[in-house]
Structure formats: C-alpha cells, structure tokens
Amino acid sequence: MNLIQTLEAEEIARLNKTIPDFSAGDTVIVNVNVVEGSRKRVQAYEGVVIAKRNRGLNSGFIVRKISSGEGVERTFQTYSPLIASIEVKRRGDVRRAKLYYLRERSGKSARIKEKLPARTKAAAASAA
C-alpha cells in the first residue's frame, strides 16, 4: 500500500462514517445537511442509485428521482460532511453497474425489480 492510499485509509477511519452497503439499482434515502442563512436543517433526498464510483476517499454516487414529472439527478460524495446519513430503503435487481439508460425511460419501463433476500435451507425446509 503506497503513501497516498495509507493517508486516505487513515482519513476514512478518522471520519468514522457508517456507510451502508448499497449498489446501482437500490433505492436510498440520503439525508443532507442544508444551511440556509443561519439555519441548519436536514433534507431527505430519496431516489434510485444509477451509478456508484469507488475511489477511496473520492467515492461518490448518483441518485435519480422523479420530482413533479421531471427527472432530477444529484451526485453525492460518499464521505462528504454534508451527508448526515444514508439509508437503503429497497434493494434493486439489475444487471448493469451504471443505469444511465434510465434517463431515456419514463413510467413503467423505468421501474426496477426488487431483489428478494436469498432463501436459506432452513427456510426452504420449513416451507415444504
């Protein structure tokens, strides 16, 4: 591990952020710290992750949502101090790492199938 990777790993450990395991296709709720004048509040941004970029401290992800009939995308830096928390609401079952094709789709064709948790042998035996 070189010096830059070591420094980035130390900085990530110092930030002590709990980032859930999510990927493209998942529906997430990102709570963002918003400063308006002297007031500070938390704003929730809910949408589908269409891209995730894993670059250590420079990691980021793009969340897309439909707001009053118009598609809105927002890029978040994973370790940004503006992000209060990230919550995974729903797992999506997709076959691509980048879901940029959703930009051209609307309505039912833009839906993503839900990924159901894998059945264990004990659960399968009790169901039979």
UniProtKB/Swiss-Prot annotation:
InterPro entries: Ribosomal_bL19, Ribosomal_bL19_CS, Ribosomal_bL19_sf, Translation_prot_SH3-like_sf. Gene3D superfamilies: 2.30.30.790. The keyword Ribosomal protein applies. One of its GO terms (cellular component) is cytosolic large ribosomal subunit. GO terms for biological process: translation. It comes from the Bacteria. Pfam families: Ribosomal_L19 (PF01245). Belongs to the bacterial ribosomal protein bL19 family. PANTHER family: LARGE RIBOSOMAL SUBUNIT PROTEIN BL19M, RIBOSOMAL PROTEIN L19. This is Large ribosomal subunit protein bL19. It comes from Verminephrobacter eiseniae (strain EF01-2). The lineage of its organism: Bacteria, Pseudomonadati, Pseudomonadota, Betaproteobacteria, Burkholderiales.
